[in-house]
Amino acid sequence: MRTVVAIILSVFVSLTAMPVAAQRVDAKPSFKIEYQKFTLPNGLDVVFHIDRSDPVVAVNLTAHVGSAREKAGRTGFAHMFEHLLFLESENLGKGGLDKLSARIGGSGANGSTSRDRTNYLQTVPNDALEKMLWAEADKLGWFINTVTVPVLEKEKQVVKNEKRQGVDNVPYGHTQYVIDKALYPADHPYNWQVIGSLEDLQAATLDDVKEFFRRWYVPNNVTLTVAGDFDPVQAKKWVEKYFGEIKRGEDIAPLEKRPGVVKETVKFFHEDNFARLPELTMAWPSVEQYHPDSYALNVLTTYLTRGKRAPFYQVIVEDKKLAPEVTMFSFESELAGQTQLEVRAFADKKLDDVAAAISEAFAKFEKDGISEQDLARIKAGQETQFYNSLSSVLGKSAQLAQGNIFANDPGFAAKEIDAILSVTAADVKRVYEKYIKGKNFVATSFVPKGKAELALSGSKRAEVVEEPIVQGAENEVDPNVEAEYEKTPSTFDRSVEPPYGAEPQVKIPSVWEQKLRNGMRVFGIRNSEVPLVQYEIVIDGGLLMEDINKVGVANLMARLMTQGTAKRTPAELEEAIQQLGASINVSAGTEDVRITVNTLARNHEATLALVEEILLEPRWDAKEFELVKQGTVAQIRQIQANPNAIATLRFNELIYGKESIRSRLPLGTVESVNAITLDDLKAFYAKNLSPSVARMHLVGDIDQGRAVKSLAGLNEKWKAKSVTVPTVKTPAPPTESKVYFYDVPGAVQSVFRFGYPALAATDQDYYPAIVMNYILGGGGFASQLTQELREGKGYTYGINSNFSGTKVPGPFTIASGVRANVTLEAAQLVKSIVENYPKNFSANDLATTKSFLIKSNARAFETSGAKLNMLENISKYGLRADYVKQREQIVRGMTVERIRELSGKYLNAGRMYWLVVGDAKTQLPRLKELGFGDPVRLN
């Protein structure tokens, strides 16, 4: 992936991919998405979907190629190619797509690679559609000559950094590698990971790149999807103009379906440098995507592990108390599928005991089967899930492309839902017996380093390749070398960027507001695009209301509130929520406790009645309290070993001071959580939860009158009390910079958190400072930090900077993860960029900043989530409903001189905390060269 962003690729990726909601089973909605499809003479499939709700369009280019089409010894190539395709093309120029995206106010060019496909997608204001089609065509037809050896060598480092960040430097990162190596034969294309191996990535040559492109990136292997507010007649003409002359490639034969083979059960173990809890994973070969049995397998895995009625929950979590949760899913790809079961046990639990409990849970299922009631409950979430997938044109475009690529039917997702709704109890039992019961499997035990005795008996050591840290192991690449190449001919001058279309008319949503008699303020936006209602009740306080010596009370209270009510057992409450097509979650953060709800509009009142029960009639179940405590302790233990989590926690301690409640993790510590009693939760609830400090944000297919009427019960029953949320002072910035180092032995990446206590969101300079930061590190691939550290040097997979104030000053932060052996060099480069930012900021930078921040307003209110965020800003900070327009005027009035003034005021490399989390043995001594004295070691 280009960025760490997940995109919904199907209405039903897997029932196990998200919490199961529910609908009334007697409802029979249409799951059809309207589309138009045509094919150019060169074989390019084009799919259009019209959505007039917002002045935006999503453009999605999907190639039917992933890691399954790679050659042995060149693993990771499809994914690396995804990276290369963003860098340059003949007419866009170097970094042209990212520069274009910034200028037109796009969401940012993004992409992802799977085993079987690679996609490139972005949402833009609809006046830029022709520009995007021109750009995507340039990538497909006028790209390959721009790839040179220096370009390839630099991007290898970026991809290797992505692997370090997502696989090598995180707990359990190598699990799937071990599973797939055993599940599929060596010559099976699913035997290796999409990210590939570091050795294979380094071995890739320029000839490999060109061969791969010419074989797979041809029109007859690509689908172009456009979804949003546009003229399809005009768009078709543009598609024909820009894509039509790209030559068709050789015909591509489909690969044969080839399920995994496990001739005998095999068990492996690995002592994980970052794991603090033992984890058992079991995997069985199953079926490929769209296989008739895949839908019953998804129902099976959901029933076995999700919810209070699940056999695995009852045995492993409630009875044996071996783990806080169990996860099982059926994952289908184009050629084969696999069913996996994962149990991350509590500290020091033997995985043999977990395996015995798994057998007991399977036996329970064999005895009891699945009831019609449970089957209906699992199916019930499909309507809500479907409508949630329609919340953005980007999601729709990806969904349509997925269906076209793999089923030759853009609307195939609707057939998948019908297939799920047709699954019977007999089907569920049959697929269990066919694919799971008594069948050979692969098992992995990932245990903390030094605790091999926790692994499953009979396990052999897994062969995991772990990268050594060697200074100077990678050659530096000059990013300024210009490629010399012969231009690819065209029938017209493609170097001329198309003009904008008609300027989009951005309509700010109409906001209604009402204060209830009990003091709660309600803010709403009617949104009738889909028949859903989404809302959140935000109760100010959260961590800020806690005793610093017993942190974690608010979090435990929030988690316990959904574990039953005075009227309903935990299982009964869960079932009632699911039967309404709803999800209800309660969480606690630093500044608030938040109830988040998603439901079908027709079930709004019934869902709200359950919210009332949860909020006003907590069960305070002692058994569930102990389970929640155990799960929280397990979560804390794991966070303590994650370098990114460590960096965030230690940075907060530097920013706020160790004695400030704001420096603490809302989860608490192992010691504080173990000391908390049920009476502590009751006392916190009684003292701090009041409508007088509550706000409700509601977006959905419901008008103000109905919404307010539905709140009559909550208005009457929830009595106000006097609650004062303390104001915790933020310290002043440091008077001089200092380097702080937290040691994670063997870390192959160093995690950076550089910054200082900065501004409150209510400060008059706050939004201007955000504008100032756009080119520094807030603009993604348009930012200097990304262009220098990732695109120029290949030091990192990603880096950003931001201001994160609330009602009180919050930090300015520069965050990244860099390969360990350039820790000093990367920090020096960041320091140089910050120091020189005022004088280097140019008129072109200002134009890019203005263009993005103004034009991106066309996307500002597209999704329900965006509208909820708008209401949050209004209710929390007292902003006007048209604050977006007010901010637009600030941007229009910005000058280079003002940016330089702001950067001089709020960017001072000499008054920051410079925190590094990494391998002290190899990196700590070098950091004195950063010029801030001897580093302070934190552990």
Feature-to-residue mapping (PLM):
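Metal-associated gating/positioning segment near the N- to mid-region
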Residues: 84-92, 99
